[in-house]
């Protein structure tokens, strides 16, 4: 993933309030300061992840997945991988890996960012990971 592509998408994102503006700024700072902002080994402060919001055709139901390590129901998503050329590729790969969905109709065909979040991830000693943040 080319950081300049994500930077352009983040700069085009319209924050929804003060918290959103702060998170947008922190994401841009991570892109500007980290040599590997997409690497899951980047734990200080963290790294970028990508997720999808999946609705049924009537837009009445939302797909959530139980995250076993965290014990939370979350939208499908995960870490960037080396072969991910852009945000859309990462989202579609994660969606396929986690749900088995291979064909989806994008409501947002340009894959523009419509929501951002920075959330804390607790240490996972079994993976040798300390606490960090996901910039999603």
PLM segments and residue spans:
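Active-site segment of metal-dependent pyrophosphate-handling enzymes
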Residues: 100-136
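Generic N-terminal amphipathic, Lys/Arg-enriched alpha-helix
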Residues: 3-14
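Conserved Nudix-box catalytic region and its N-terminal flanking loop in Nudix hydrolases
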Residues: 60-104
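Short acidic (Asp/Glu) patches
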Residues: 34-38, 48, 87, 117-125
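Acidic, metal-coordinating catalytic segment for phosphate/diphosphate chemistry
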Residues: 12-51
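Histidine-centered active-site/metal-ligand motif
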Residues: 47, 67, 79, 130-134
